[in-house]
A protein has these predicted regions:
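Short-chain dehydrogenase/reductase
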Residues: 85-86, 127, 131-140, 167, ...
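Conserved Rossmann-fold NAD(P)-dependent oxidoreductase catalytic core, especially the SDR/UDP-sugar
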Residues: 94-134
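Adenosine-cofactor binding site in Rossmann-like domains, unifying the SAM/SAH pocket
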Residues: 39-57
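N-terminal Rossmann NAD(P)H-binding glycine-rich loop of SDR-like oxidoreductase domains
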Residues: 3-34
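NAD(P)-dependent short-chain dehydrogenase/reductase
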Residues: 144-197, 202, 238
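NAD(P)H-binding glycine-rich loop region in Rossmannoid oxidoreductase-like domains
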Residues: 52-89
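Active-site Tyr-X1-5-Lys
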Residues: 118, 130-155
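C-terminal substrate-binding subdomain of Rossmann-fold SDR/epimerase-dehydratase oxidoreductases
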Residues: 185, 190-192, 197-299
Length: 299
């Protein structure tokens, strides 16, 4: 649940985006500039948070009046081993030290719905975080580090799977399906695509983030839509964007004996905080990305 420190929306004096070269970070910086909000984008080329002493380098760039957004993370597609987890924890530790030293006005930390165990099928603001993956445990540890010193100014956003044209992760879902269709004319599904997962369009996640920044909200928000289509449904939506439609192939599941995982979200918390928040239906988001890709190809 979120609590607003600003009674009315107010543009931040400056937003420092740590992890600004990534999919979400670059979209956030673009939207901030579009809205006329001062933004300082920082990447690992500016401050490498895996390195000892990086907290001093980051703190030296910050002002007490800043709103600070933390996105830096090595996602599972970059590695699932212990070394990657430890690097992520080091980044979180150094960021927390810098944030505490700079005493910024507002902090927004991007976590993940991986903080909930894979077998957690229904998630609301009240659901206990019980990760069963190193990635989820890492994000929860980072949350705890920040809450221990900055709880009074901290907002945590826990997004689900994010999709958009500029995504670089090639994650299973709309992004990968579109690229498969474009390259090979077919989409490969695990099993029959029964698994149901929420997917949020990048523009909607950025809109939620801007609202959190303007209201200087604290607490936790789920970065989700409240709809969980099956991967088969998503594949069909992507396939029909092409002419002829992409073929859909069903591959054997890696572990047929394992249960099919589903996850559904209750978005009451976000709608209570922002009653007019609206989300792009997956069918509209998939069609929009296809148009954007076509326009980019012919630009």
């Amino acid at each position: 649940m979120l609590v607003h420190l600003n009674h009315n929306p107010q543009a931040p004096e400056r937003v420092v985006v740590v992890g600004a070269r990534g999919f979400i970070g670059s979209a956030l910086v673009s939207r901030l500039r579009q809205d006329g909000v001062s933004a300082l984008p920082l990447s690992s080329a500016d401050v490498d948070l895996t390195q000892p002493g990086s907290e001093e380098a980051l703190a030296g760039r910050l002002r007490p009046t800043d709103s600070l957004v933390m996105l830096s993370c090595r996602t599972p597609d970059k590695g699932r081993d212990l070394a990657t987890t430890l690097q992520n924890l080091a980044m979180g530790h150094h960021f927390a030290l810098a944030a505490a030293k700079a005493a910024c006005r507002h902090i927004v930390y991007f976590s993940s719905d991986a903080v909930y165990g894979d077998d957690t099928q229904w998630v609301s603001d009240d659901t206990k975080a019980e990760p069963n993956s190193p990635y989820g445990a890492m994000h929860l540890t980072r949350e705890v580090l920040l809450k221990s010193t900055m709880a009074g100014v901290l907002a945590v956003i826990r997004p689900t799977l994010v999709y958009g044209l500029a995504d670089t992760h090639h994650s299973y879902g709309p992004n990968r399906f579109r690229r498969m269709s474009e390259k090979d004319g077919r989409i490969s599904l695990f099993g029959h695509g029964e698994e149901r997962r929420d997917h949020i369009f990048i523009d909607d996640l950025i809109e939620l983030t801007l609202r959190v920044l303007r209201r200087r909200s604290i607490g936790m928000a789920l970065g989700v839509t409240g709809r969980s289509p099956s991967f088969a449904e998503i594949a069909a939506l992507v396939a029909k964007q092409f002419s002829p439609p992409a073929a859909i192939l069903n591959l054997p599941r890696a572990n047929p004996a394992a249960p099919v995982l589903h996850r559904h979200f209750d978005i009451t918390g976000v709608l209570t905080a922002f009653p007019d928040m609206r989300y792009t239906p997956i069918e509209d988001g998939v069609a929009l990305i296809h148009r954007q890709a076509r326009e980019a190809a012919h630009a």
